[in-house]
Amino acid sequence: MKVYLENTLESKESGEWFTIPINLKAVEHILGKGSYVVANTELPFFLENGHYDLEELNRVCEKVESFSDFFPQEDIIEIQKKWFVSIFDLLDHVNELEYWPNCTSILEVAERIIESGDLPGDLKKHLNLNRYAEDLEAKRDFLITETSVFERRK
C-alpha cells in the first residue's frame, strides 16, 4: 500500500511516494516540514485525495490488512462502493458484514444456510432452494463479487 504525498506549504510542487506504514520523520526529511496532502494512492480501497492525519492513515491501512483474515482485500472497493461513503465508514461497520466465501450466487448462499442448519436430511431434499434464494435476495442486502458473496446485516 502506497500514497503519494505533497507538501502544500512548499512553493514548488514537491511530492513523493511513501509505503504504508508511513514514517513521519521520513516524510519531513524528504518533503520538509509542513502540511501534507494525499495526491494519489495505490490502496485496496478508495480514498479521496486530500488532507489526512498520517498516523490515522497508518492505522486504517493496518486494519484493512487485517481484513485478509476475514475477506479478500480485492473486494474492499466493491463493498465500499455499495454500502459505505468512505473507508472510515466501512471500518465503523465492518461487524455488520457477513462473508460467504466461495459462493458466487445467492442460490449457493441458500444452500450453505440450509446445509449448516439443524434440518433433518430428509426434510432438506423437499425444500425449494430456488424460492428460498429468491426470498433471501428480496429480504436481505447482498453484494456478489467475482469470488464471493457479502451480506450487510444491520
Where do the protein language model's features map onto the residues?
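Short, Lys/Arg-enriched charge-dense amphipathic segments
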Residues: 58-65, 95-100, 144-148
